[in-house]
From Swiss-Prot:
Membrane topology, from the record: Single-pass membrane protein
Protein name: Regulator of G-protein signaling protein-like
Disordered: region residues: 834-854
GO CC, one annotated term: membrane
Lineage: Eukaryota, Metazoa, Chordata, Craniata, Vertebrata
Keyword flag Membrane: yes
Domain of life: Eukaryota
InterPro entries: RGS, RGS_domain-containing, RGS_sf, RGS_subdomain_2
Domain (RGS): residue spans on this chain: 645-764
Keyword annotations from UniProtKB, A to Z: Membrane, Transmembrane, Transmembrane helix
Main subcellular location of this protein, as a coarse class: membrane
Gene name, Swiss-Prot/TrEMBL: RGSL1
Compartment annotation: Membrane
Length: 1076
């Protein structure tokens, strides 16, 4: 028998002896899916019931225990709470013995869940298969921590058949052995370290000193013994309130109406300096007296209600200010890839994600408790699903599964982790569409057609957040009557077991309402139990509040569900405070007081009618004065060259400073500041600094007094979208940067360009246009027609040239010829220039010795060239541009094929992995290379950052490399045009019989080594350019050329053969260097 089966067959009165079991079992019993939520206090062995049983009925604890064993304990054995309790017992038993990774804990829990299932049972076969595939995908992989720490060979385990009886037994034995090894690792290493860490952390907290003293007393006390025996004095707490009829459904609705829905995100932090009383020990008659100015309390009951409302209000304020890590957000526990062999009929296997009911998903009073119940059903062992299964309600079961899968999809969607979520979210969305929304598999679910269509269209993309709450609300409405029937059936069996009565008479005493403070405490207990059950899937570092909370938890008086009302904040008499003290303690109240005082002043002040006019003088500044004001500034020097476009201005430091002063004179410097700020964000590599920079940009340009359109002087629609976004990404800001840059170029660049004298060619073109404008209209029309015809001919010739280029690249030999030409362009000393010691931008003649000693150590001299558009490129990267352009075209072809596959419903995970692999290869080779420089193509830095940001965000479309294609394409066409001209010239001269003076190809590295350093011995050396080399001495073969007249002076000598152990791409593995 497994441990869960042993627990299920043990008498509950024996299990409740254990304080740890009572704590886990109380958490399970308080889940909101159940109607009756009893609570057991270990200290006085007393049960507290909610809803309470009427006073005329006598509740017996033996009947209650029988009902718990029949209706609650079997579901508890199926939950993660039970498996964590078993692991906790293993730890405790190890601690009490004389001896004394998170991933190992996950593996132990998952293996325990698998070993507790009978795989031959047809009803749970799909669930068993899904758990097994999840185990393979997460922990049984080569190189995983579990396999490494357990020192197991998993090949034999992975090759076992799933359904073969003998092999199933073998699998159980192997998993059981691995589980024992993992438990030993946890007990022998992680648990002692955890206890050491716990003692050191709790010793720093003052609230934990009493707990530490008790621990030391028990540790060193020899006479300390555990008090055993059965709790024969077990009892049930008496009822304090009179009610006509017992109904958990009505009690839930009353509680939901009394509790404010805004308190759904309420944190349950305890007082650090006081131990709170559990719900059962809270006295409902206790009064909270609060003195407020100019208010008279009508009665003590009104005082309690108002104080509780304030308590909840300020608890929300404190929770928002503290932002404690214990607050549970939507996070997805899945970070691994799901096996592609998972069948669609298998229910998704997921650890319960930590969910918080957000204010965005607000339900009505009638559906609020159903929303909580459906959240808790999976954590409680699916009792509501089991009820629907007994009634054979297949459609309702499918609706419940859809609700829980949508809840899990929402948690994956809102997860803040980045690695792997895009693929899993896409797969989960496709699976939901295929399993629930596909009309070909079965009948359509009874949801609205608009909701189904919205889910179908937006689930795979992830933009489905508005449709998930709508679909869940429709499902809640349809499951509401069945859930009420489930609660009624629970009430029937509970009363039958506990009181031996099936019906309750309606004759009762006067009705008394339950206080609101009790409902708040009860709601906190229910919410805490749900959060604890969902939090078992994720383990995080505890903050100081959680360590202090451990000190206040007593397993005998509530344990983990020990809750209390948060102490009110700022509930002091504000009339006795000075205004400065009020501003310091409560700024919001101080502002409100100022507003009230001003309102009273306006009401009492005499009204005087007067008119006020504001006369604004208009400044008329001529263009010549603006030029002079700019020229008068001595700090900013006017550049000498006239810029051709705005990109040149932004890339040139001197132009940028002068352009900034130009915009400052015209009060239009804010758009340029935005461009500079976004450029800093795109360069920044630290995520925290990048987030802070983005927040500063949003506060400065989108949350100011003026509208963002006026500040940025741009009317792009994306500005309004960014202003309404909660989370703004870097790629979105880069997109807006392009729009703002275009707006600046349209409004101000022409005026800025007019500050500089035009080029000679521009003057000629302007003169021709002025002369032609004076000619008759017929001549002008003829000229326009001819120029249009010439333009079309040039366009046709350009398209033909590009088509010829693509055909040329398909032939490997011709492609190699083009690459050889690009190598020759490196030696073009007329047009190339180096930028090693030249910062002015003027061309400098390249050095004759390109392969210098510095280059031997890996310092490559970058050769530059100015092409059309006055763009400066690196000639060294021309071949890389050729390959980069080709790889980007191949990626776009993959995107097109993936789109066609998606239309034909043949799109799967392999296509996504293939495209991601292609993107990673392009990134590693050209944009983020391991060999300096990292950027090895002629693409601007901001364009590279935009591509990396798009890859990080998970985009898989043509827009990823669109900007890079537009940057590299002119470079490739420039060299292609020159290559065609060079080839035609060479063919013509060869045809005429003339010699064609070709530039020498780049010389191969002929490195000379001093023979005195190595002699006849082998040498091992390392350079950044060629890596590790093995140099061996060899005899040089005397050639026929050396036997000539000059060979008299040439003596046979040693040469060095260099074998490269780690060759660079494009070089041979081994070669021999010879000297002549």
């Amino acid at each position: 028998m497994s441990s869960a089966e042993i627990i299920g067959s043990t008498n509950l009165i024996i299990l409740l002896e254990d304080e740890v079991f009572a704590d886990f079992f109380n958490t399970f019993l308080s889940l909101p899916v159940f109607g009756q939520t009893p609570f057991y206090t270990v200290e006085n062995s007393q049960w507290s019931l909610w809803p309470e049983i009427p006073c005329n009925l006598i509740a017996k604890y033996k009947g209650l225990l029988t009902w718990l064993e029949k209706c609650r304990l079997p579901f508890f054995c199926k939950t993660n709470l039970c498996f964590h309790y078993i692991l906790c017992q293993e730890f405790i038993s190890f601690i009490k013995s004389p001896e004394g990774g998170e991933e190992l804990v996950d593996f132990w829990i998952l293996a325990e869940n698998i070993l507790s299932i009978d795989e031959m049972d047809l009803e749970v076969r799909d669930y068993y298969l899904s758990l097994l595939l999840m185990l393979r995908a997460t922990h049984l992989q080569e190189g995983s921590r579990v396999v490494t720490l357990c020192n197991m060979n998993i090949k034999s385990l992975l090759n076992l058949s799933i359904w073969h009886p003998n092999q199933s037994t073998t699998r159980r034995e192997i998993l059981s052995h691995m589980q024992k090894v993992a438990l030993f690792k946890l007990q022998s290493y992680w648990l002692p370290n955890f206890y050491t860490h716990t003692k050191m952390t709790m010793a720093k907290e003052e609230a934990c000193h009493g707990l530490m003293q008790e621990y030391e007393t028990r540790l060193y006390s020899v006479c300390y013994t555990h008090i055993g025996g059965l709790p024969l004095n077990m009892s049930i707490k008496k009822c304090h309130h009179f009610q006509k009829r017992y109904s958990s459904r009505k009690a839930k609705r009353k509680m939901w109406q009394l509790v404010d829905p805004d308190s759904w995100s309420l944190e349950m932090d305890l007082k650090p300096d006081a131990i709170g009383m559990p719900l059962q020990e809270t006295c409902p008659q206790e009064k909270v007296v609060i003195q407020m100015p100019s208010l008279k309390m009508a009665s003590s009951k009104e005082t309690r209600i108002s104080s509780l409302e304030k308590d909840m209000h300020y608890a929300k304020i404190s929770s928002m200010e503290n932002k404690a890590k214990s607050h549970l957000h939507m996070e997805a526990p899945f970070e691994t890839k799901v096996s592609t062999h998972l069948r669609t009929v298998i229910p998704i296997v997921n650890h319960s994600s930590k969910m918080t009911i957000q204010k965005a998903i607000k339900q009505s009073f009638s559906l609020g408790y159903i929303h909580l119940a459906l959240c808790a059903d999976a954590c409680a062992g699916n009792p509501f699903r089991d009820h629907l299964k007994k009634l054979n309600l297949k459609v309702e079961i499918q609706l419940l599964d859809l609700w829980q899968d949508l809840q899990h999809f929402l948690s994956v969607l809102l997860n803040n982790k980045k690695n792997g979520n895009a693929i899993f979210r896409h797969l989960l969305g496709d699976r939901i569409c295929e399993l629930y929304l596909n009309e070909q598999i079965g009948p359509c679910l009874p949801l609205k057609s608009q909701t189904i269509q919205g889910l179908k269209e937006l689930l795979p993309s992830g933009d489905v957040i508005p449709w998930i709450p709508k679909a869940q609300k429709e499902i809640c409405k349809m499951l509401s009557p069945w859930y009420d029937e489930f609660l009624d059936e629970e009430d029937y069996w509970f009363l039958l077991f506990t009181t031996q009565n099936r019906f309750i008479s309606s004759r009762q005493h006067k009705r008394e309402f339950i206080g609101k403070e009790e409902n708040i405490l009860l709601y906190k207990r229910i919410q805490q139990s749900l959060e604890l059950s969902q939090a078992l899937a994720d383990m995080k570092e505890m903050d100081y509040r959680q360590w202090r909370k451990i000190a206040t938890e007593d397993l005998k008086q509530g344990g983990s569900l020990q809750v209390e009302l948060t102490s009110p904040v700022f509930l002091t008499d504000i009339t006795k405070m000075s205004f400065e003290e009020l501003c310091y303690k409560n700024p919001k109240m101080a502002i409100q007081k100022i507003s009230d005082d001003y309102k009273i002043y306006c009401e009492k002040a005499p009204k005087i009618d007067f008119k006020m006019e504001i006369i604004k003088e208009t400044k008329t500044v001529s263009r010549s004065n603006r030029k002079m004001s700019l020229l008068k500034r001595t700090l900013v020097r006017k550049p000498s060259m006239r810029p051709r476009n705005l990109t040149e201005v932004l890339l040139n430091t001197q132009h940028l400073e002068f352009f900034r002063e130009f915009l400052k004179e015209r009060k239009a410097k804010i758009p340029l500041q935005f461009l500079t700020a976004v450029q800093k964000i795109s360069i920044e590599t630290n995520e925290k600094i990048c987030k802070s920079l983005i927040e500063n940009v949003i506060k400065t340009f989108f949350q100011g007094q003026l509208s963002p359109e006026e500040m940025l002087q741009c009317d792009a629609p994306i500005i309004k979208e960014i202003a309404s976004m909660r989370h703004v990404t870097t790629s979105t800001l880069l997109t807006l940067q392009g729009h703002v840059m275009k707006s600046i170029e349209e409004k101000w660049f022409k005026d800025y360009q007019d500050l500089f004298p035009p080029h000679h060619q521009e003057v000629e073109v302007q003169s021709e246009v002025q002369i032609s404008s004076r000619k008759p209209s017929k001549i002008v029309s003829t000229y326009l027609q001819e120029s249009q015809k010439k333009g079309w001919m040039r366009m046709i010739s350009f398209i033909r040239s590009f088509c010829k280029y693509r055909r040329f690249m398909l032939n490997p030999s011709k492609r190699q010829e083009f690459e050889d030409y690009l190598h020759q362009e490196m030696q073009n000393s007329k047009e190339n220039f180096t930028t090693a010691h030249n910062t002015s931008g003027r061309s400098a003649p390249p050095s004759t010795n390109v392969r210098s000693a510095d280059q031997e150590n890996g310092e490559i001299t970058l050769v530059k060239r100015r092409i059309f558009g006055h763009r400066i490129i690196t000639v060294n990267f021309a071949i890389n541009d050729l390959y980069f352009f080709s790889e980007m075209e191949k990626f776009n072809d993959l995107v097109s094929s993936a789109h066609m596959l998606q239309v034909n419903r043949a799109y799967n995970e392999n296509d996504v992995i293939l495209m991601r692999s292609k993107m990673n290869i392009i990134q590693k080779l050209f944009l983020n290379s391991d060999i300096p420089p990292k950027l090895r193509v002629n693409v601007p830095e901001f364009q590279k950052d935009a591509i990396l940001a798009a890859i990080t965000e998970g985009y898989l479309d043509r827009s990823v490399f669109h900007g890079a294609i537009m940057s590299v394409f002119p470079v490739v066409m420039y060299f292609w045009k020159r290559f065609c001209f060079w080839k035609a010239t060479r063919s013509y001269l060869q045809y005429r019989g003339k010699k064609f003076k070709d530039r020498k190809s780049p010389p191969k590295s002929t490195d000379k080594y001093p023979f005195s350093s190595g002699g006849d011995n082998a040498i091992l050396r390392f350079t950044l350019l060629r890596g590790i080399e093995w140099l061996q001495p060899q005899r040089e073969a005397i050639s026929s050329v050396q036997n000539s007249s000059s060979s008299k002076l040439t003596q046979p000598r040693l040469v060095v053969s260099a074998m490269q152990l780690h060759p660079v791409q494009g070089q041979k593995l081994s070669y021999i260097k010879k000297e002549k």
